[in-house]
Amino acid sequence: MKHLSIDIETRSSVDIGKAGLYKYAQSPDFCILLFAFQEDGNPVEVVDLAQGEEIPEHAVRMLADPDVTKHAYNAAFEWYCLNRAGYRTPLEQWRCTMAHGLYCGYTAGLDATGKAIGLPQDKQKLAAGKALIRYFCVPCRPTKTNGNRTWNQPWHAKEKWELFKEYNRQDVVTERAILNRLEQFPMPEAEQKQWQMDVLMNAFGVRVDTELIKGALYIDAVSTQELTEEAVRI
């Protein structure tokens, strides 16, 4: 079985903290800026999609290949965003390193988990990430100084962009280093299935009997009105 570790950097005008992943990725201006990946023990590669680079054909094939296990930290994000961007990759082929860490008693954060596990400095997450994400991944306020632009592009701050690419690369390094430690304590298949079900329910909802729901709402409305009228009479 081959393994592919992935981290992406994205942008959208929708606030992911307020609206959640799905509204964020469904925004018309959503796009993937950077795609970092590592095949097994090979060096991490970073694809600069924002500046016209394309994901290598063999990596695109691996995304859909059932013989390749895909890994990411908070894999629900990578899985959903890649599918929204047109890269078909089934959820059952994904493994979430964050969920694995939570199963083993660690925190949800990549940075905090890396430190808790005791990763060496060169394997830990870069601290500059939050500022870079605010600069490139969140709309900016148009001003005369910035030419009334609403997005900061790579060419507006080339040094920052190169650091952002390094941040993207390092996230894969950190995720893979954490995974190597966690693999000593495999996540049970039942836990994996539960994670998949949770992701799918959040992405697509659950089937319900709509007629039953309509009936329940009607009964609620009628009973509320009757009880209100009774309270007024009393």
What are these regions (language model features)?
Residues 27-37, 41-183, 190, 195:
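Active-site-proximal helix-loop-helix substrate-binding element of RNase H-like nuclease domains
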Residues 5-7, 72, 94-95, 208:
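Short hydrophobic beta-strand that contains or immediately precedes a catalytic carboxylate
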Residues 1-32:
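Entry/capping segment at the start of metal-dependent catalytic domains
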Residues 9, 75-76, 213:
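An acidic- and aromatic-residue-enriched active-site/binding cleft used to recognize and process polar
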Residues 4-6, 114, 216, 224:
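Hydrophobic, aliphatic-enriched repeat segments that assemble into extended interaction scaffolds
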Residues 189-234:
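Extended, well-ordered alpha-helical scaffold/bundle regions in very large, multi-domain proteins
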